[in-house]
């Protein structure tokens, strides 16, 4: 659906690979990572750098449950296993922390979200006491099930011994003829496990990327989140919806960024820096009281204090 020769997980948001976003947010919460890949995955392995990664091959694609089953030899009995998805790049660290915390208490926690339009997603089925009973996929859902707006994100955390046990009990008796990872929820309920649910506050945080439209939406959401964080730290943005940082930006006091400015790579701004509209700044350091005039392109440069930079100079 990406209509690209590039692997989906190597498309970028904020100039960072989708999979790298997931690795970066997870690495501070886990001791090791098992990443499931298919054949012809050398480009993915070469692009992603993290010492905690163990690459696991899934020879045949027989569903999400089958994918996770490939990691069984590497799952430790007393560990908490966190299951994430390579095409969900906006997940926040605090959400992972909460999910793991709940799993340590009950043995199993699940991340859900409420959508106005839940079409295509697995629905969370609860009993009369509000406890999670099962997850029903769109193609297997009844008319009553389809009215439910709380959906499964697929993101979960559970005890390693439980995960191994339930993965080995998965069946393929569904419309797709696949091993659904979500079926372990119903198996756990029958095993008298009380599944802790955590409803994600923002649907944006758990959006998956399946096409170029969703990729562009994720890019804008990511940039707006960065803009909000920068403004909270004192940066003045004339219009945060027309601001892009595709890398790392540090800044001093009283800096102002006008519209349509793009930062790429690693950039450092001193105090009282003014960047005018339509500038591109890449891997540069700009000194105190500098003024960057409209339409300037600065690449791998050091700009001195109290300097005025104009284009075509």
Where are these regions (language model features)?
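Short beta-strand/turn micro-motifs composed of small residues
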Residues: 6, 37, 85, 112-113
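Left-handed beta-helix
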Residues: 176-313
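N-terminal nucleotide-binding beta1-loop-alpha1 segment
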Residues: 1-5
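Conserved beta-strand segments of alpha/beta enzyme cores
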Residues: 9, 52-54, 131, 194-196, ...
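Conserved N-terminal catalytic core of the sugar/cofactor nucleotidyltransferase
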Residues: 12, 16-94, 98
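Conserved core of the sugar-phosphate nucleotidyltransferase
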Residues: 91-175, 184, 193
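Short aromatic/basic micro-patch
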Residues: 12, 90, 157, 208-209
């Amino acid at each position: 659906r990406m209509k690209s020769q590039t692997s989906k997980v190597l498309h970028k948001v904020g100039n960072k690979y989708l999979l790298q976003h997931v690795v970066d947010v997870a690495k501070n919460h886990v001791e090791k990572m098992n990443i499931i890949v298919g054949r012809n995955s050398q480009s993915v392995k070469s692009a992603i750098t993290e010492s905690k990664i163990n690459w696991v091959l899934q020879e045949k694609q027989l569903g999400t449950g089958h994918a996770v089953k490939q990691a069984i030899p590497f799952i430790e009995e007393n560990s908490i296993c966190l299951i994430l998805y390579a095409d969900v790049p906006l997940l926040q660290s605090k959400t992972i922390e909460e999910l793991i915390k709940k799993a340590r208490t009950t043995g199993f926690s699940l991340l859900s979200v409420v959508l106005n339009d839940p079409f295509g997603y697995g629905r969370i089925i609860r009993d009369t006491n509000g406890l999670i009973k099962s997850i029903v996929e769109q193609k297997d859902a009844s008319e009553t099930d389809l009215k439910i707006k709380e959906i499964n994100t697929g993101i979960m955390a559970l005890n390693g011994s439980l995960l191994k046990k339930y993965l080995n009990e998965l069946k393929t008796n569904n419309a797709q003829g696949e091993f659904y990872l979500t079926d372990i929820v119903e198996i756990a309920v029958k095993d008298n496990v009380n599944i802790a649910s955590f409803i994600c506050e923002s649907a944006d945080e758990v959006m998956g990327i399946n096409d170029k439209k969703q990729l562009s939406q994720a890019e804008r959401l990511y940039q707006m989140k960065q803009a909000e964080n920068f403004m909270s730290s004192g940066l003045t943005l004339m219009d945060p919806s027309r601001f892009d940082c595709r890398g790392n930006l540090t800044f001093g006091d009283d800096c102002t960024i006008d519209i349509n400015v793009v930062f790429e790579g690693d950039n450092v701004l001193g105090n009282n820096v003014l960047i005018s509209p339509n500038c591109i700044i890449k891997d540069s350091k700009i000194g105190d009281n500098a003024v960057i005039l409209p339409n300037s392109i600065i690449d791998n440069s050091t700009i001195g204090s109290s300097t005025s930079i104009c284009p075509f100079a």
